[in-house]
Amino acid sequence: MSGIQATDEARETYQKLSRSKIQYVVFKIDKVDGTEVIALDCIGEKVKGDEGQDACWEDFCSKLPENEGRYGVFDLRWTQDDGRKRDSVCFVSWTPDGAKIRQKMMYGATQESFKGSLDGIKSTIVAHDASDLTDERASVLKK
């Protein structure tokens, strides 16, 4: 464990997602007052029903920089072929191939402790490029 803790703002924003107020949250490791912390990067507004889920996922993915790591949490919702409604609060670890080695190590070392501090996570996506995001989301939606 790296010892990097989430800011109060980051934790409070995640609580809004878990109470179905927002669709996704993106976090980044940042320096605040000389200390590395997991901070809020951006949020995505809630979409109603299954409609808009794909567009919202695309918007979420567009917030993940090509050369910097991020964590994300996305409230996935879908209807299965048999008509059953499903949902999964999905943790996303984004460490792109273009990120610096030190940054990849920090995100890797902090991932499990940060994810463990977030109640209600049902699935995890570990992605290094855009195709990983697409493939892993499809895998979650099949479960």
Regions found by a protein language model. Give the residues of each.
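Long, low-complexity regulatory segments enriched in Ser/Thr/Pro/Gly and acidic residues
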Residues: 1-143
